[in-house]
Regions:
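N-terminal basic/disordered segments at the start of proteins
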Residues: 1-28, 88-113
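Catalytic-core signal marking the mid-to-C-terminal active-site face
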Residues: 2-11, 22-35, 43-58, 377-415
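Short beta-alpha connecting loops at secondary-structure transitions
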Residues: 17-21, 298-303, 331-338, 366-378
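N-terminal small/glycine-rich loop or linker at the start of catalytic domains
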Residues: 28-32, 37, 101-123, 321-333
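Glycine-rich, N-terminal phosphate-binding loop and its surrounding beta-alpha-beta segment
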Residues: 51, 55-120
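Short juxta-domain linker segments that transition from a proline/glycine-rich
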Residues: 102-104, 108-112, 132, 141, ...
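Helix-rich catalytic cores of soluble enzyme domains
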Residues: 124-355, 359
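Short acidic/histidine-rich active-site segments
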Residues: 359-367
Length: 415
């Protein structure tokens, strides 16, 4: 467990956040679940070009029409609750860096994921490269506030695509001994990184433990593409963890309302979470439902909007009702530079994730321009702020003897 987030700080954060959580809105949560069940039963989920997934879902009771499978949401929840662990250990090369993920554990913080562009400390703007990637991994390792070094912190534009998974793996293993995330470029790449990471960690497989967490995204609305489906299968069969997420643009790829986005996103992730358990009961999973308003004038998402924070709070509660760890987003922003806008928007999103009880917070440092850019300056500032979140405070002074205090006060009065 990270030294900067001892148990008492998780408990304190939970106490403060309890006032904002919708756990008392039992009727609202049940309405979302029932509406998602209706979406699954009447509309279904599209599983593109993956007959294996469709076949296994049919065996589990799904009704397939082409690549669309209609599902029983209540049964999916039963599968998830029966098999998915509420907590698991994410291992690093250094056992002292191992991080628990899930119920009662501190949040895990990982940096931005997937930025093609980089802004250096001197303000120069470059495409991502192997050299820069190694520097970002080293920065994540040196930051006490980041307990996971992530994956694809920037895109290695100077490296051929088929080499990037192993180049990133080498950077994470050689520049850090913290846990990191797995690669999903292809099922073969995922398996290769899993096997090589297991060799580097050099510890036997153990129930409730894994070496990598992989980002598996649905494609809203109500679709899974072939590569995430095949990667999910390969990852689950290897006993590694998947973070099954729906990342929606409200008004573009999902309904514009908070409730509508929650219903759609919950239907999407239920299917993915249950699939992992069908492939391998007990496979570690994390649930993510994230939605951001879409600005139709600029044709870009608006990060930091309060609507997205409501989605986070309800998504976290839905995840707790399933009994699985929950994803949150970190200091994400629509700002182009690291300014007051980026601080305000990023701070709101990060605060909502922490207060909601999120177990794994992605994009916790470095994010600019709707995620198209990683900034070294913002990376360092965000990481420093994360370290302060769990920094122990000085204990109060020992109480002064009452008689001495009275004597001093009386002398002051006489003066």
């Amino acid at each position: 467990m990270p030294a900067s987030w001892p148990k008492e700080y998780r408990a304190a954060a939970d106490f403060v956040a309890a006032a904002y959580r919708p756990e008392q809105d039992e009727a609202g949560l049940e309405t979302i679940e029932r509406a998602a069940d209706r979406v699954l039963e009447e509309t279904g989920i599209r599983f593109l070009d993956d007959p294996q997934t469709i076949d296994v879902l049919k065996q589990a009771g799904g009704v397939a029409t082409g690549d669309v499978v209609r599902l029983d949401g209540a049964e999916l929840r039963r599968v998830i609750r029966r098999h998915a662990p509420a907590k698991f250990l994410l291992r690093g090369r250094n056992p002292a860096r191992d991080t628990p993920v899930g119920a009662g554990a501190p949040p895990v913080f990982a940096p931005i994921y997937g930025a093609p562009n980089v802004v250096l400390d001197n303000g120069a703007r470059e495409a991502g490269s192997r050299r820069i990637y190694g520097e970002l991994v080293a920065a994540a390792h040196a930051a006490p506030g980041l307990t996971n070094t992530g994956q694809m912190i920037c895109v290695m534009e100077d490296i051929p695509e088929d080499r990037r998974p192993l180049e990133m793996l080498l950077a994470h293993l050689s520049r850090s001994d913290k846990p990191f995330m797995g690669n999903i470029a292809s099922p073969a790449a995922a398996e290769a990184v899993i096997d090589l990471t297991a060799a580097a960690v050099a510890r036997p497989a153990s129930a409730g433990e894994c070496n990598l967490l992989h980002l598996i995204n649905a494609t809203p609305p109500l679709t899974y593409w072939p590569n995430p489906l095949k990667c999910l299968r390969a990852i689950a069969l290897k006993g590694e963890a998947s973070m099954v997420s729906s990342y929606m643009m409200m008004g573009a790829t999902s309904p514009v309302t908070v409730a509508g986005a929650l219903i759609q996103g919950y239907a999407e992730v239920l299917a993915g979470l249950a699939l992992a358990q069908i492939w391998r009961p007990g496979a570690p999973v994390v649930m993510g439902i994230l939605a951001y308003p879409f600005d139709m004038r600029r044709m870009l998402p608006s990060f930091g909007d309060p609507a997205s924070q409501l989605v986070q709070f309800y998504a976290a509660e839905l995840g707790r009702r399933l009994g699985v760890p929950i994803r949150g987003d970190g200091a994400i922003t629509s700002a182009k530079i690291d300014d007051a806008q980026s601080g305000a928007e990023g701070g709101r999103v990060l605060s909502a994730s922490v207060a909601s009880g999120a177990s794994f917070i992605l994009h916790a440092s470095g994010w600019l321009e709707q995620g198209r850019t990683v900034s070294f300056e913002k990376f360092g500032r965000d990481a420093a702020a994360l370290a302060e979140l769990g920094k122990p405070t000085e204990p109060p002074p020992l109480p002064l003897d009452r008689d001495i205090e009275t004597e001093i006060c009386s002398r002051i009065t006489r003066l």
